[in-house]
């Protein structure tokens, strides 16, 4: 629930306390809640950049937390198309993200592979343990394991989002370009559990919040064919056994060139963004 100011919450007498109105003993009473001094300092620092909203009470892992949100005005950049520098991001299940810094003339200024293999191994190891427990004694004994897997999955999404935003700021990009990914519906195949755990929307939303805070715009393009088509225009790319490779991350173009699939897809994402902008202008 949300604690609205004056009606549900008030500042406490001590700077590190706050008073909340809660339903206790069949009546609404004011109680004093102590906050960590480090959290209070963080709230004060954030309040300098924007307006603080009413706190919200949340329950996580059998504990209660107060979440404060901040609202502020930010001017997004309006760089001309000829001078615009973008960060094209191809997100995937095997490699978390592949980023390419591009300009309108097609020049690739930088490339970045983002992959937290250790975090994913920890998650997949936990999921395999869940399978074994469910097979032997049912699903009633897996709550703790599921909580552990979800926690590390959320942490992985935060790490990937932070790395993408840091890359955009490092190379002074004006726009971050994502694919519009829609994986709704029933998943099939051997990777259905990985797809179910893939927090692509959380990553994109977190990156958008971090980017807007620093004046960087975020755009989405159609994902159709970005991975299947070769970036050099030679046609469809062959992957995995079709190209004679054991790895699905390496592809072969129609002209015989071997290249990284995700890197080629990031080039296509950037090119598709600039084509759309040129047509609109």
What is each of the regions a protein language model found here?
Residues 1-60, 197:
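Acidic carboxylate diad motif detector
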Residues 62-281:
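Positively charged, helix-rich recognition surfaces that bind polyanionic ligands
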